[in-house]
């Protein structure tokens, strides 16, 4: 997961002009500014929590935000707010499938907020990428990747709370 995110950040840094802000625990790959200004924040060094760093990030107005891990409700809520306000947000969450990722985000919120969160996700979600390492018969491991793109159909199912239908699309 770290290598995949580092590759995505490197691609954006080489391809687009803008401001990239990463919030990580720990910083695993150091990104030098190329076409983008890259600022990297590390938990325990530059900030006390992902949520605190995200609050500060929204004042810095980055174009792209990488959240190393969405561990709590506050962080998830702030990541959604950042996406709603036009930031491209990359974040990690430990789940086993794309629909379960959406479930986990929604379930982090109290029941009375879940309809609103489904609406937010349906408006902002671009994609979910799920990775797992599978054992090879010959030894070693190989990456298996699931990609769910935020198509109109996927967005509608998220909004309507019909996540169980996503694998059928």
Where are these regions (language model features)?
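Short, flexible helix-loop junctions that flank or precede catalytic/ligand sites
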Residues: 1-169
């Amino acid at each position: 997961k770290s290598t995949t995110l580092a590759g995505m950040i490197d691609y954006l840094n080489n391809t687009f002009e803008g401001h990239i802000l990463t919030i990580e625990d720990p910083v695993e790959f150091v990104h030098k500014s190329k076409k983008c200004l890259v600022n990297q924040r590390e938990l325990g060094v530059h900030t006390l929590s992902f949520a605190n760093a995200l609050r500060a990030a929204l004042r810095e107005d980055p174009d792209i935000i990488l959240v190393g891990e969405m561990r709590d409700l506050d962080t998830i809520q702030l990541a959604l707010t950042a996406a709603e306000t036009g930031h491209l947000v990359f974040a990690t969450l430990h789940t086993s499938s794309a629909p379960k990722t959406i479930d986990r985000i929604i379930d982090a919120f109290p029941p009375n907020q879940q309809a609103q969160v489904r609406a937010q996700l349906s408006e902002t979600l671009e994609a979910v990428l799920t990775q797992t390492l599978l054992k090879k018969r010959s030894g070693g491991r190989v990456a298996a990747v699931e990609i769910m793109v935020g198509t109109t159909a996927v967005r509608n199912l998220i909004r309507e709370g019909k996540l169980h239908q996503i694998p059928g699309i």
